[in-house]
Amino acid sequence: MEYSNLSALQLDALKEVSNIGAGNAATALSMMIGKKVDMTVPAVNVIKLEDIVEENGEIEVAGTVVRVLGDIAGNILLVFEKPIAENIIEKLVGSKQSPESEMGSSVLCEVANIISASYMNSISQLTNLAMAPSVPATSYDMLGAILTTTFIESNQYDEYILDIETVFLDDDTAENIGGHFYYIPMPGSLEKILKSIGIN
């Protein structure tokens, strides 16, 4: 499926599917850090990868990739800016740790594991398609480098890519807390998702 050929109806359907998954993911993150976290309604866009990289590329982030296995394969990428990553790690282990440390990386992998599992479970129930997480891997780099690698690993080599992005918000202030959640389906997975909910 050429992403540039997706109709408004198809994009809206993907947004609704992602919204259900994102709500469960926000609940999982809230429970982990003991603070209410909201998420924006997912943005589902067909855009040029170079445009995402140009817009966000220079931000240093901790990025954790969870490969999605099963009927609708792809990648989930959880991104936190460094201060947020450090706060989450400290909240969970009780001491300051760098996201680049072994302990910090391990904590972020566990956070990604729980959040992505919540996201996958809700989508799997909605679509009746099997999804399972792989072992997460965390890296610390410029956001542009992490995004490019993740999209290419999802076999999204084309000029246009499908970007399903959700932003974490502080429930008290409604401000972006510096966290982003991307679901990047492999070629062929989109058709299965749309077909399962009666959209062709």
Predicted regions mapped to residue ranges:
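Composition-driven recognition of glycine/serine/threonine/acidic- and proline-rich low-complexity segments
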Residues: E2-S18, A22-N24, S30-N200
